[in-house]
Amino acid sequence: MPVSRNTLQPVPDKWNAFYCRLSRDDDNEGDSNSILHQKQILERYARDHGIKQYRYYVDDGYSGTNFNRPGFKEMLADIEGGHVKAVIVKDMSRFGRNYLEVGMYTEIRFPELDVRFVAINDGVDSEDQSGNEFTPFRNIINETYP
């Protein structure tokens, strides 16, 4: 296991990616979508599911229709590098609001790379296909209702 140069602590080879995003428009809705609120939901999920190794990727002030976001790109680089075992978000709209692009990642790219995808509040978990039949419809709604 590699060691972090900054802390001399072991760095896990694989971790869970906790992704948070807040656009300027979402900010008008108050604390319900705030980055802090998203992190609280993700941390509760981690506790409830015994997840110990995770890393946050955050894009504050970026639209979900734009996938050229710094935190998102950093997460993708870590996924492509084989370091991420799961991407976990508060809900599908936090991941993105472009139906085709979201579907490309969640339905094609992540499965190709053996990366699990979880959207907590939407009940989406790529390991449990029984609850995922409405995921494409959620993506369409998220795209049309920013």
Label for each model-derived stretch:
Residues 1-146:
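Short, structured surface patches at the beginning of a domain
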